[in-house]
Amino acid sequence: MPIFIDRRLNPKDKSLGNRQRFLRRAREELKRSIRDKVRAGGIAELDREHVVPIPRKGTGEPTFGDDKESGRRQHILPGNRTFSSGDLIPKPGGGGGYGSAAGTTESEDDFRFVLSREEVLDLFFEDLELPDLVKLNLKQVLSFKPRRAGFAASGAPTNINVGRTMRNSHGRRIALRRPKQAELDAIARQIAELEAKPASALVRERIAALREALDRLERRRKRIAYVDPVDIRFNRFDPQPLPNANAVMFCLMDVSGSMGEREKDLAKRFFVLLHLFLTRRYERTDIVFIRHTHLAKEVDEHTFFYHTESGGTVVSTALEEMHRIIEQRYPVAEWNIYAAQASDGDNFAGDSERCIELLDRKLMRLCQYFAYVEIIDERESHIFGATENGTSLWRAYNAVDGKWPNFQMRRIAAPADIYPVFRQLFARQPDLRKSA
């Protein structure tokens, strides 16, 4: 039967076991509190420590007790100096409001629990994932990772395992009874002591015997090396093929003049949430940021979120830039390719047909998943309730949505819509995204 010993150190002033047990019990309450903050527009504050209030009544430990309605018990109730048999006990006094008077009973106030940044992100993104991250038909695997596979008797000098080598050397010296230096030093001292005494036949005979023994031990010591080539061990590494699960996410954001500050703010909040999700849940995920007006270009993270450049609107330039980067840096045989696009739906006349052509003929054949988010006015959310109504880009993308199952499109009208839309796009169950 395996025995697992948890040797992790407790955080400062905390009990790790109790903390994890509480997180399991209060998981749903904690997730609800975090999501309420995000719906209120606090996405930028998600990547930090949080103080979450939890009702105290939900934190009690379950206990076993006697059933007062059954069984037979004998007990003695203590007397008192205030009441006699038959007296009525008055109700406890209270104030004029809804609260109760001061007393010694247990309070039902909220209890505040501090969650670390890692715990917040783990709870928030617990049931989300990139769809179809590992391809079903993997092509030839070209990348390998060295993995420790024990020891070998030959190898490169840089891979010598000193500990295992000295262990083998020590065992061999014991087995072959290699003389120790202390034994030779002891015989040499005896010879020196005898030579200091007056010479006699017995002393000379004893010195000759000791010299012969010393010579024999030295010869044996030279024959049995301290470290023999047979002792040397090298760390052995076997090449382990890496699964073809590298992923790249293309973030395409419209920053043209038609996108006002409100629309840009909602788009940036969506991409902040996406960026946190990718960096927290996946170790090897490249993120490519593309901003576009009438021109599109790849930018760094800071420029993507904070640059103020504006201009006309030609959405197809962003799709063309994405296709160019895929051909240059991300072979489809080695990468899972994803894309998320945010725009207000305004586009140059005739360019929406070009977008359909790029998606149908090129990008959708390369992408595992493509998500389009359209930023609309809150009043438009009531007018464009049906998916077939909307901007020219929305109507054009509707044709793509009906043809490609790995294409999804949603609308965002207010900060409170960001998280529900994000969950619909990246829910763990693929069928929920279509039905949502």
UniProtKB/Swiss-Prot annotation:
Record keyword Hydrolase present: no
Domain of life: Bacteria
InterPro entries for the chain: UPF0229 (IPR006698)
Disulphide bridges, residue numbers: none
UniProt keyword terms in alphabetical order: Plasmid
Annotated region (Disordered), positions in chain: 54-103
UniProt family annotation: Belongs to the UPF0229 family.
The protein's name: UPF0229 protein mll9637
Organism of origin: Mesorhizobium japonicum (strain LMG 29417 / CECT 9101 / MAFF 303099) (Mesorhizobium loti (strain MAFF 303099))
